[in-house]
Amino acid sequence: MNDNQTLNEINYKLSFFWIKKIIILLLRFFGIILDNFYKKDFYFCGDNNLESYFFGYHDKKPFNNDDTKIIFHSYKNLKSLENQSKKKVSINLINLKKRKLLILDNTKAWSWQLGSSLQWHPNKDIVFFNKKVNKRYITRKIDLNSNKTKDLNFSIYNISPKGDKFLIADFVKLGMLRKGYGFKKKKSQMVFLNKKSKLEIIINKNNKRKTLHLFDETKKKDVLGSYINHQTFSPNGKKIGYFYTLLKKNNQRQIFFYHFCLNKKKNYLVNISKSKLISHYCWRNNDEILITMKENEKRYLYIIYNTETKKIKTLNSKLNKDGHPMFNPKNKDLFVSDTYPNLFGLQKLFIFSLKQNKVIWKRYIYSPYKFRGILRCDLHPRWSNDGKKIFIDFIKNANRNIGIFKTSV
């Protein structure tokens, strides 16, 4: 191949790149026009254009136990979102009745998708989040009634329904192997990517760390590293669902979904299909899990998997896009979910009824093109504890924001 051929190929690829980008931007511009026709009946929405607001992942609730307060992150807007990921974010609280914002603290231990694992105690006005103190990652606990603060010697992922146990995560490892989900470290502080991953739990009574299950891939030469992510308790706190991922040398990720039974002290692989990729999940009850699963390159499935009987039920075929589901805490017939932006940049937020086998409520939210990849802003819908409101992260005026919808379904 001569130099002219090489140059022609480069010019062709560059031309194709710009043509593709222009088409995408034109479609997104049309999406902005469409967005103006869709209903935006927010009960609450952040209104400070100088700051960006967001909560985090869809497996936690920003509402306190009686739904009178919400917690979320904020940061002052910068031109470069990449620069923001190196800075602190504020931990905030709003009283929904008074609409008054209170800054509780700040943290550098956060990521775009998970935030700082900010969450409430299930029954008390106590807030937990990850924080970096004296070069160590810890969990900060703030009791809003007593104004007392306590630092716990672990990084929290999720708290149990009774508030007596914590699931913890290796966020530094996540930050290296799953960008956008973990904590960043300087190159000089990079830790060795070992091939061992632990499912760990903290018992609240004595803060004792316990390993529930150990994965060891050290003998597998084609494995570069491994990590555990998205650990959640079943409603009664007796089971734990989670993803275990292998990073292969061919830059491929092999993802497995497990549930661990605390009573039996056993780990179970959810072996639905070797060819279908499980992407997101939520607990419906103590035995059933709602799963979004990739069927092929263009289509996803929503299925309900029973951890006891191993039976699978596939939902309405029109639910063919990936999303982040959560069941209504008061009505297990209903779940809320979302979609990723389509060609026009529109994300769909919807409520699905299992009994009616259809979508019974929906809204469309526009997402600008610059919020993609690691920097994307998924809606990550979450119910309030009374099952009457839905909280989302979204983009408003080119900034991250939070919004709450009231529903009457």
Locate each region found by the language model.
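Asp-box/WD-like beta-propeller blade repeats and closely related beta-sheet repeat scaffolds
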Residues: 106-198, 213-223
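Blade-terminus and WD-like Trp-Asp/Gly-His loop motifs, strongest in beta-propeller folds
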Residues: 60-70, 110, 114-130, 157-165, ...
